[in-house]
C-alpha cells in the first residue's frame, strides 16, 4: 500500500508520455531509494527549468535565454524550417545537417480539433520573412493535418518572395519527425523539393 504522497507522485509520473503505472512505480521506487543521487538533483533541475526556460518569442522553441540561442546565432543560414513541435526541432538539431533557424507551430491545422491558422503563430512566421530569409522548409508530418498545414503555408507564403520547400521522401506517411533516426532525417532534408 502506498501513502498519499507516493500515490500522487506515481499518478503524475504515469501521465508522462511513454510511461504507464508500472513504469511510474518503478521510477518512483528508484528515486526514493536513491534520494541523494537521483531525486534531489532531479528536483533541482526541474526547479531551474521551471524558473528559467521559456518559449522563444521569435521561433517558439524553448531556451533559458530570450531570444533563444538559435535565433540569436548570426552564423545561422538564412533559412527557416517550420516544424510542428519543439521535439521536431530538437530531432533536426540532433541530426546536425541543418544550420538555419526554426519556426515551431505548436500544432497543426485541424478542423476536428478546432485549430485554425491564428492558433499556430503563422502571422509571426510571415512577419519574420523580411527579405533576409531565402527559403522556408516545411518539415511537417506526413499526416492529413500535416499535409493540410503544408498546403495552407505554401499558399500563404506564395507572395512573400521566398522559396518554399518540403522534406523529401524518407518521412513515412503517418510518421512524426521526432521519432526518425538521424540518417533518415539527413536524407529527407537534403532531398527536399519545392512545395505546391
UniProtKB/Swiss-Prot annotation:
Gene3D superfamilies: 3.40.1360.10, 6.10.250.240, RecR Domain 1 (1.10.8.420). A zinc finger (C4-type) spans 56-71. GO terms for molecular function: DNA binding; zinc ion binding. GO terms for biological process: DNA recombination; DNA repair. Residues 78-172 form the Toprim domain. Coiled coil: none annotated. It comes from the Bacteria. InterPro entries: DNA_Rcmb_RecR, Rcmb_RecR, Rcmb_RecR_Znf, TOPRIM_dom, TOPRIM_RecR. Keywords: DNA damage, DNA recombination, DNA repair, Metal-binding, Zinc, Zinc-finger. Belongs to the RecR family. PANTHER family: RECOMBINATION PROTEIN RECR (PTHR30446:SF0). May play a role in DNA repair. It seems to be involved in an RecBC-independent recombinational process of DNA repair. It may act with RecF and RecO. This is Recombination protein RecR.
Amino acid at each position: 500500500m502506498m501513502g498519499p504522497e507516493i500515490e500522487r507522485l506515481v499518478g503524475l509520473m504515469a501521465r508522462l508520455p511513454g510511461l504507464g503505472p508500472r513504469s511510474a512505480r518503478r521510477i518512483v521506487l528508484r528515486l526514493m531509494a536513491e534520494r541523494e543521487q537521483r531525486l534531489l538533483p532531479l528536483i533541482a533541475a526541474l526547479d531551474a527549468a521551471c524558473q528559467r526556460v521559456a518559449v522563444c518569442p521569435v521561433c517558439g522553441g524553448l531556451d533559458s535565454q530570450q531570444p533563444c540561442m538559435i535565433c540569436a546565432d548570426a552564423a545561422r543560414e538564412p533559412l527557416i524550417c517550420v516544424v510542428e513541435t519543439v521535439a521536431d526541432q530538437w530531432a533536426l538539431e540532433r541530426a546536425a545537417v541543418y544550420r538555419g533557424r526554426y519556426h515551431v507551430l505548436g500544432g497543426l491545422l485541424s478542423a476536428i480539433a478546432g485549430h485554425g491558422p491564428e492558433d499556430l503563430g503563422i502571422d509571426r512566421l510571415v512577419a519574420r520573412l523580411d527579405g533576409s530569409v531565402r527559403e522556408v522548409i516545411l518539415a511537417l508530418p506526413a499526416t492529413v493535418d500535416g499535409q493540410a498545414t503544408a498546403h495552407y503555408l505554401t499558399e500563404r507564403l506564395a507572395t512573400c518572395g521566398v522559396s518554399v520547400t518540403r522534406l523529401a521522401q524518407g518521412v513515412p506517411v503517418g510518421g512524426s519527425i521526432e521519432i526518425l533516426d538521424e540518417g533518415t532525417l539527413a536524407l529527407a532534408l537534403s532531398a527536399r523539393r519545392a512545395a505546391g
